[in-house]
Swiss-Prot record:
<dbReference type="GO" id="GO:0006537">
    <property type="term" value="P:glutamate biosynthetic process"/>
</dbReference>
<feature type="binding site">
    <location>
        <position position="240"/>
    </location>
    <ligand>
        <name>substrate</name>
    </ligand>
</feature>
<comment type="subunit">
    <text>Homotetramer.</text>
</comment>
<dbReference type="GO" id="GO:0004359">
    <property type="term" value="F:glutaminase activity"/>
</dbReference>
<feature type="binding site">
    <location>
        <position position="165"/>
    </location>
    <ligand>
        <name>substrate</name>
    </ligand>
</feature>
<keyword id="KW-0378">Hydrolase</keyword>
<protein>
    <recommendedName>
        <fullName>Glutaminase</fullName>
        <ecNumber>3.5.1.2</ecNumber>
    </recommendedName>
</protein>
<dbReference type="InterPro" id="IPR012338">
    <property type="entry name" value="Beta-lactam/transpept-like"/>
</dbReference>
<feature type="binding site">
    <location>
        <position position="189"/>
    </location>
    <ligand>
        <name>substrate</name>
    </ligand>
</feature>
<dbReference type="InterPro" id="IPR015868">
    <property type="entry name" value="Glutaminase"/>
</dbReference>
<feature type="binding site">
    <location>
        <position position="158"/>
    </location>
    <ligand>
        <name>substrate</name>
    </ligand>
</feature>
<feature type="binding site">
    <location>
        <position position="63"/>
    </location>
    <ligand>
        <name>substrate</name>
    </ligand>
</feature>
<dbReference type="Pfam" id="PF04960">
    <property type="entry name" value="Glutaminase"/>
</dbReference>
<feature type="binding site">
    <location>
        <position position="114"/>
    </location>
    <ligand>
        <name>substrate</name>
    </ligand>
</feature>
<feature type="binding site">
    <location>
        <position position="258"/>
    </location>
    <ligand>
        <name>substrate</name>
    </ligand>
</feature>
<dbReference type="GO" id="GO:0006543">
    <property type="term" value="P:glutamine catabolic process"/>
</dbReference>
<comment type="similarity">
    <text>Belongs to the glutaminase family.</text>
</comment>
Length: 304
């Protein structure tokens, strides 16, 4: 376990970067977040959690939720049913690209871009009676925090600005790769993105990725092989168009969200969550990436 002093050092080391990025402003509920917040939490495979900075401050997890939705799908479907509808390759286009969906005849490149996550949400909608409730149940169980909830204001705000995601869904439907009612699936998807959690919650919830598929309670969520495969996808496609830069600087599987959070994993050791709302040009937390880079250097850890 890293010492608390190291986590505090990491936060203070990157604090001067605050002010150099840009808070997501495509929906008002995200634009109003305090840009000066910064936090980090780590959870070890022994179940111990440490944090520094604003690590107990809840934020909108946004695309980090795509890890949970894919994990949930893996517990409900045969793998062939999932991967026949969504690929495993890095995108190379923006995360909300329509062009790529058209070129690839409705099959999204990976489950971590919007098109791929919408297909996963479509799969969950068709298999679960109450997909929003099931997701809430899962993240509360994984984080050991029954106060985790959806931010209704964020979900509603996303829905009011949903034209592009609706276009992606309808385009996939035209290719036969979207089964459900678009409006219903969009509402479910936006609720997933509107989950509100803090760094401690997320570092605990993602521990299964560091612990061979076993959650913080020791329950097996997905198999050891599935965990390894999921980490591989996170390493290649988890950071929008910044996955290569992140692998170079940080060297860990990770997933970011435009709320400023990033989760990362050192397999066999620990899961990490950092948060700072200001983003770089790829939509990844600027100070968050720097915190993870500094931590990986100080710990001497990389998967490469």
């Amino acid at each position: 376990m890293p010492e608390l002093a190291l986590l505090e050092e990491v936060v203070e080391k990157v604090r001067p970067l605050l002010g150099q990025g840009k808070v997501a402003d495509y929906i008002p509920a995200l634009a109003s977040v305090d840009a000066g917040k910064i936090g980090i939490a780590v959870t070890t495979v022994d179940g111990e959690t440490l944090g520094a900075g604003d690590y107990l401050e809840p934020f909108s997890i946004q695309s980090i939720s795509k890890v949970f939705s894919l994990t949930l799908a893996l517990t409900l479907y045969e793998e062939a049913e999932i991967w026949s509808r969504v690929g495993k390759e890095p995108s190379g286009h923006s995360f909300n690209s329509l062009v790529q969906v058209e070129l690839e005849r409705g099959k999204p490149r990976n489950p971590f871009i919007n098109a791929g996550a919408l297909v996963i949400a479509d799969l969950l909608q068709s298999r679960l009676g109450a997909p929003k409730h099931r997701m809430l149940e899962l993240v509360r169980q994984l984080s050991q925090n029954d106060k985790v909830c959806f931010d209704k204001q964020v979900a509603d705000s996303e829905y009011q600005h949903s034209a592009r995601n609706a276009a992606i869904a309808y385009l996939m439907k035209s290719f036969g790769n979207f089964q459900g009612d678009v409006d219903t699936v969009l509402r479910t998807y936006f609720h997933y993105c509107a989950l509100k959690m803090n760094c401690a919650d997320l570092s605990k919830a993602m521990l299964y990725l560091a612990n061979r598929g076993k959650s913080i309670t020791g329950t097996e969520l997905i198999s050891q092989v599935q965990t390894r495969q999921l980490n591989a996808l996170l390493a290649t496609s988890g950071l929008y168009d910044g996955a290569g830069e992140f692998a170079y600087r940080v060297g860990m599987p990770g997933k970011s969200g435009v709320g400023g959070g990033i989760i990362a994993v050192i397999p066999g050791e620990l899961s990490i969550c950092v948060w700072s709302p200001e983003l770089d040009g790829n939509g990844n937390s600027l100070a968050g990436t720097a915190m993870l880079e500094h931590l990986s250097q100080r710990l001497g850890r990389s998967i490469f």
